[in-house]
Amino acid sequence: MLDRRSVLRSGTALTMLAASGSAFAKPAPPEAAKLNALFDTFMSEALDRQPEGVTSLGLDTGSRAYQKGLLANRSLDEIAALKQLNVSQLTRLSAIDRKALSGMDGVNYDVILYGCQQQAQTDKRFQYGAIGTGAPYVLYQLGGTYQSVPDFLDSQHQIVSKTDADDYLARLSAFGTAMDQEREAAEHDIALGIVPPDFVLARTLEQMTKLRGTPAEKSPLVESLARRVKQKKIAGDYAGQAARIVGEIVYPALERQMTLLKSLQPKAVHDAGVWRLKDGAAYYAASLVSQTTTTMKPEEIHKLGLDLVNSQSAQMDALMKANGLSKGTVGQRLRAMFDDPKFRYPNTDAGKDKLIADLNVKVRQIRAMLPRFFGTLPKANLIIKRVPKNIEAGAPGGYYQPGSLDGKRPGTYYINLRDTAEVPSWTLPTLTYHEGIPGHHLQGTVAQESPLPLIRKISGFTSYVEGWALYTEQLAVEFGLYDKDPWGHIGQLHDAQLRAVRLVIDTGLHAMHWSREQAIKYYADTLGDPVSGATTEVERYCVWPGQACCYMIGKLTFLRLRDKAKTALGARFDLRKFHDAVLLCGALPLAVLEQVVDAYIAKNKA
C-alpha cells in the first residue's frame, strides 16, 4: 500500500482526474476550496520526491515523464527533509478553519491531519527506523531496496517504447546508489544500537545471497527487460547493457549491504521484540497507535486475542466434529488437514499453474455475486500471480498490489507458492476473498475510482484496509459461499483464528518479552500450520511491530459499526448502502470511520 507521504499529486494528474476530483464537481465553499488546493500542493510536493510512486500511480507521463528514469533519494539528508516537509504540511493544514468544513471535506481534513500528527510525533521521538514503513530496521527480510526495486521494475515499470527501455536502464543504474544510501541510513541506526535480531539478519542475507548468486546475465533484473523488449520488438542490446549494469553497479552495492549485515552477526542478539531497542517500550506503544489508530494497550489487546482464540477454537471444534474430525486438539486436527494429500496441489510448476487457474474461477464466481451486496463495484481488473521466486523465501503467504489510477495496470493478488504444502486447497478461498474480491482489490479500487481527492485515494491506514479485508472473509460466510464447502469454512475460521493469534503473539513478542521460539510454538500448536509457515509469520511480526494487530481490531470495528447502523436504522438498514458509506470515503483512522457511519445513520434516519 502506498504511503500518504510518498505519492502526491502532479499537474498532469490534476488534468487526468479533474472529472473525479471533489473540487471540480461544483464550486466549493471558500475554506473547502483552500483545503483542496492545499491537498493538490501536498501531492505535488511528495510526487517530486517519489519517482516510484509516480510510476505506481501511472502518472509518469507528460510533465512527469522524466521521473520514469529515476529512483527516489534515500539519503540521510532526504530523510531529514521528509520529516521537515511533514511538519510544514501539518502547519499549513492547521491553518485551515476546520469549523468551516462540512461533509467529506471535514472527513478529508480529519484524515490527513491525523496522519500528519502521528508522523510528526513519531519523527520527533524516534530517530531510527525505515521511514514510512513502520519497521524499526532499514534492512530486513521484508523490506529494503534489494527487494523492492527488482519487484518494482518487473511489475510496475511498463515497457512499451524504446524510451521506456532506456528509462529502465537508467533506473537500474540508480539502483546501486539507492542501496548505498540505504546502507548509510542503516549505519546511522546501528550507531544508535538498532540492530536486527540474529535470525532477521540470517533471513535477509539468505535472500540477498539468492539475488547475488545469480549470474548477472541471468538476473531477473536483466531477464525482465530482455523479455519485454523482445515482446515489443524494440531493437538494441538491452540485455547486454542491463547485465553490465547489474555486474558493475548493482551487485557491488548489494555486496556492500551484505558485508554490513555480516559484520553485525557476531554481536547480534536473539531477542525478538522491540522492547530491547532504545526507548523500545515507547516505540511499541507508538507503533500500536500508528498501526491500529486506537488507544488500546498491549495488555488489553493480548487478552482480546486469548479470548478470541478460545471462542473460535470452539467453533472450529464443532465444525470439525460435524465432518468426521474428532481426534486430538483443534491445532492437531488442523495439522492433519495440512498433511492430508487430498488437499494438496502438486509442488510442480504445472500444479502451481492449476492452483492459480482455480483461484481465477473463484474470483469470477464471487464477482458475479457482488451486485447483491455492494452498490459501487470496481471497474479495474484483478490478476493473480506467484510471488517472485527470488523473494518468496521471506515473503508472506499472499499480498495485494494496487493497480494504476488509469486502470491500465490491473490490481495484482500475489500468492506465495514456494511450497504448495503451505497452501492446501481448504485455505485458498478465504485468502482469495481477502486479497482480491471483495477484500483489498474491491476496497482499494473503489477508493481509486471514487470522487475523492488523490491524497485520499492513496491513504493507507492499515487497521481500515486490513480490517476491511478480514471483515469480507466473514461476509463470505454470510453470503453462503461455504454452505457446500465445510473444509473451506474451516479454512475461514482458521484464518480468523490466525488474526486472533496475531494479537497474542505481537503483544507477546514486543511487550511481554516472548522469544521467537515461544511465538512459533504457540502459532503452530494453535493453528496447525507447518513450522516453516509459522516461522515466516512470526519473523514478520518481529520486524513490523503492531501491524499484526490491525486485522482483527479493524474487523471488529467494522462489525460493531454495522451492528450500530442496523440497530439505529432497523428496517431502513440497507447493506449495500452501508458498504458504500464505508468504502467511498477511502481508508480512514477507525475513529474517523465511526464519524462517517454516524453521519450515514443520521442521513438515513431523516
Residue ranges and their predicted role:
Residues 26-606:
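N-terminal maturation segment of proteins
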